[in-house]
C-alpha cells in the first residue's frame, strides 16, 4: 500500500455543499451547517474549505455569545485548523485568503476579551497573508474585503497597543478600509461568483461605518442601497443583518424603525441565540420611554452568558424604574452593576461609575437624554423647556448637563449656532470635570465645523476633545476625535 502526504491531495473547493453551509452559518444555523460540512468531509475528505467554515462557526459563537469557555476552546481548535490548512495547495487563491481571514476572526475575538496586544499581532500576520495574496492573485477580489477590515481594525486598536502595528509597518486607515469593503460589497452584488459573500461584506461595512463613521445616516444610505436589491441578495433578513440594521437605526435616532426591524427577528431552537438583540430592543424602548422596556433587559441579563454590556444592562434596567419614580428598584439594579460584567467597553465603564459613586441621574435630564437619543427631539425640547431651570438643576453636574443637552437638541434640530453656543458653555464649565459632557461637546463642535468645511476650527475642537481627561466614554470619544483629525488632515495647511 502506498501512502501519500496530505498536501498532494488537499484542495480548496468552495462547492455547492460548502456554499450551502456558508449560508446556514450566516443565518446562525450552526447545527445544520455542521451536518452539511460533515457530509462534505465524508464525500471529499481532501477539501479544506469545510475546515475553514468550521472556524466561522466558532468565530460567530464566540463573537456573539462571548462565553470565556467557548473562547478558550476556539483558541485550541484554531491552531489545529491552521496546521491543516497550511498543508493545502499554496497556489490556490483561497490558501492565504483562508489563513488571513482566520487570523482576522481570532483578532476580533481577542479584542472582545481585551487581548489587544495579541490581536495586534494577529492583524499584522493577517495583513501579510492577504497582501501577498493580492499580489499573487490580483483578480481574486475576496482579498479586498479582508484587507479593508485589517485597515479598519488597525485604526481602532487602542493607542497603548497601536505601537506594535507601527513597528511591524502597518498603519491603520479606517476610511480606506471602509472603501475597500464597500468595493467588494458592491462588486459582489453584480457577480454570481462573489454574490454569496455579499452578506459578510455588508455585515462588516455597515457595522463599522455605523460604529466609526461620523454620520450614521451614511451607513443608513449604504444599507438602503443594498436593501433595494433584495432580489439579488438572498438571506437579507437574517439575524446578522437584523442586528446591523437595528444598530444603525438606533445610532441614527430612528427608534420606531429600529423596533420594527427588531420585530422581524424570531429565534428558534435551531438557531444560535442572539441575546444582544434583547438588549437592543430594550434600549430602543427605553429611548421611547415605553413602560415595558424593563422586560427586555431582564431577558437579556437572565440569558446572556457573555461579559460585555452586562453592567450597562443593569444600568438601563435601573433607569426604567427611575423614570417611573421607583427609587428602591433603581438602587437595587444599579447596585448589581458592580458585581457582574467586565470593564472593556465604555458603556460598562460608565455604568460601573454610576453604581460605584452613586451618581443617580436627574430624572428630567435623563428623560431628555433618552428622547433625544431616540430621535424624539420635539418631545425632548418640550420636556426640557416646560420646566424652569431652577426646577431641573439641583447640582453643578445638573447645570453642566442641562447646557450640554440644550446643545445636543439644537444640533439635532439643525440650529448649529445655538448648538455651538451651549457646547461652548459646557466646555468652559466642564473641561476640568470627569464627566463626559465637555469632551463630547468638543467632539460635536468639531463635527459641526467639519460639516461646514471650517477645517481649522474643526481641528481645534478635535484636539481639545483629545486633551480632556474625563473618565466616561473616553475610548470612543477619543477614537472619534482621532478619526475626525484623519479625515480633515488633507484640508489643513
Q: Could you describe each region identified by the protein language model?
A:
Residues 22, 56, 63, 101, ...:
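Residue-level recognition of tetratricopeptide repeat
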Amino acid at each position: 500500500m502506498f501512502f501519500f502526504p496530505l498536501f498532494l491531495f488537499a484542495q480548496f473547493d468552495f462547492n455547492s455543499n460548502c456554499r450551502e453551509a456558508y449560508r446556514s452559518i450566516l443565518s446562525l444555523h450552526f447545527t445544520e451547517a455542521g451536518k452539511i460540512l460533515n457530509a462534505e468531509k465524508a464525500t471529499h475528505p481532501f477539501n479544506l474549505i469545510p475546515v475553514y467554515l468550521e472556524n466561522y462557526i466558532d468565530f460567530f459563537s464566540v463573537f456573539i455569545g462571548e462565553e470565556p469557555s467557548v473562547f478558550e476552546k476556539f483558541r485550541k481548535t484554531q491552531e489545529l485548523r491552521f496546521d491543516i490548512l497550511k498543508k493545502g495547495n499554496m497556489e490556490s487563491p483561497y490558501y492565504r485568503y483562508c489563513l488571513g481571514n482566520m487570523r482576522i476572526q481570532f483578532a476580533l475575538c481577542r479584542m472582545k476579551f481585551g487581548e489587544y496586544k495579541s490581536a495586534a499581532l494577529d492583524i499584522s500576520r493577517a495583513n501579510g497573508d492577504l497582501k501577498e495574496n493580492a499580489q499573487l492573485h490580483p483578480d481574486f477580489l475576496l482579498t479586498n474585503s479582508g484587507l479593508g477590515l485589517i485597515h479598519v481594525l488597525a485604526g481602532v486598536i487602542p493607542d497603548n497597543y497601536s505601537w506594535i502595528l507601527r513597528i511591524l509597518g502597518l498603519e491603520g486607515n479606517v476610511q480606506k478600509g471602509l472603501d475597500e469593503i464597500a468595493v467588494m460589497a458592491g462588486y459582489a452584488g453584480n457577480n454570481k461568483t462573489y454574490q454569496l459573500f455579499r452578506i459578510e461584506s455588508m455585515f462588516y461595512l455597515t457595522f463599522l461605518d455605523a460604529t466609526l463613521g461620523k454620520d450614521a445616516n451614511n451607513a443608513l444610505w449604504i444599507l438602503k442601497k443594498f436593501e433595494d436589491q433584495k432580489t439579488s441578495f438572498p438571506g437579507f433578513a437574517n439575524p446578522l443583518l437584523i442586528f446591523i440594521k437595528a444598530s444603525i437605526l438606533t445610532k441614527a435616532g430612528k427608534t420606531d424603525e429600529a423596533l420594527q426591524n427588531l420585530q422581524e427577528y424570531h429565534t428558534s431552537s435551531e438557531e444560535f441565540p442572539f441575546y444582544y438583540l434583547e438588549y437592543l430592543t430594550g434600549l430602543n424602548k427605553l429611548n421611547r420611554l415605553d413602560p415595558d422596556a424593563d422586560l427586555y433587559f431582564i431577558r437579556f441579563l437572565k440569558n446572556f452568558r457573555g461579559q460585555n454590556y452586562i453592567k450597562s444592562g443593569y444600568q438601563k434596567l435601573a433607569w426604567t424604574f427611575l423614570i417611573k419614580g421607583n427609587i428602591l428598584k433603581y438602587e437595587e439594579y444599579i447596585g448589581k452593576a458592580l458585581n457582574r460584567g467586565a470593564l472593556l467597553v465604555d458603556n460598562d465603564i460608565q455604568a460601573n461609575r454610576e453604581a460605584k459613586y452613586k451618581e443617580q441621574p436627574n430624572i428630567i435630564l435623563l428623560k431628555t437624554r433618552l428622547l433625544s437619543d431616540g430621535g424624539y427631539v420635539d418631545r425632548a425640547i418640550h420636556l426640557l423647556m416646560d420646566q424652569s431651570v431652577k426646577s431641573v438643576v439641583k447640582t453643578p453636574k445638573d447645570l453642566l448637563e442641562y447646557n450640554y443637552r440644550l446643545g445636543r437638541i439644537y444640533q439635532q434640530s439643525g440650529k448649529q449656532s445655538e448648538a455651538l453656543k451651549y457646547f461652548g458653555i459646557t466646555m468652559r464649565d466642564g473641561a476640568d470635570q470627569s464627566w463626559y459632557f465637555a469632551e463630547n461637546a468638543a467632539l460635536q463642535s468639531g463635527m459641526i465645523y467639519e460639516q461646514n468645511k471650517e477645517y481649522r476650527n474643526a481641528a481645534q475642537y478635535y484636539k481639545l476633545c483629545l486633551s480632556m481627561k474625563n473618565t466616561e466614554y473616553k475610548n470612543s470619544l477619543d477614537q472619534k476625535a482621532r478619526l475626525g483629525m484623519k479625515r480633515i488632515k488633507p484640508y489643513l495647511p
